[in-house]
């Protein structure tokens, strides 16, 4: 079985409870940054916020409910960014530029049910409307291996989305919906979403998660560069 990004990610997350942060010092060099301020985010002037929904901590790292973290972690890796806590906020942030567009990636330091608390205050401070917020999350009503883009709509019982709507005061934010399918007969939804994926699902050669990860990352970059209509036409017509 080939080792995939997902498997590497799992091995890292099982050892720590928060996104990787830089050391405070480097040998023979100046101290590295250990945090960001809201003022620095305002200077960066992001045109988009992208948040992945999940629960913090190694206990939940490889569960279905945390699938929304994976595309933003891949983006951090791709753009050689780093996670830093935001002073006075319930979030870790990473700053990337997609082509020429500044983008703020976020991870909530709260649990899933309070995910919106990471976004609402920052969106307000940055004067970004909800339409410029992309939420990556797990979706029971979409088959495992499929990714769908949605401009707005209800929360479908998803507590993370409920928190987003409550904090933003609107349902008009963009969703990258990552299908995990429905639980098998006899398994409750809670047990299903809080249980880990099977090794076969994340196998680099035969599993479906690599396709899901690629499509969700592409969804984000396509939305940022071209808008939701073009992104949807591309992602929704892909065959795996």
UniProtKB/Swiss-Prot annotation:
GO terms for molecular function: peptidyl-tRNA hydrolase activity; tRNA binding. The active site is at residue 65. PANTHER family: PEPTIDYL-TRNA HYDROLASE. Monomer. Hydrolyzes ribosome-free peptidyl-tRNAs (with 1 or more amino acids incorporated), which drop off the ribosome during protein synthesis, or as a result of ribosome stalling. GO terms for biological process: protein quality control for misfolded or incompletely synthesized proteins; rescue of stalled ribosome. PROSITE patterns: PEPT_TRNA_HYDROL_2. Its EC number is 3.1.1.29. One of its GO terms (cellular component) is cytoplasm. The keyword Cell membrane does not apply. It is found in: Cytoplasm. TRNA binds at residues 60, 111, 113, 159. Keywords: Cytoplasm, Hydrolase, RNA-binding, tRNA-binding. Gene3D superfamilies: Peptidyl-tRNA hydrolase (3.40.50.1470). It is an enzyme of class 3 (hydrolase). SUPFAM superfamilies: Peptidyl-tRNA hydrolase-like. This is Peptidyl-tRNA hydrolase 2. Belongs to the PTH family.
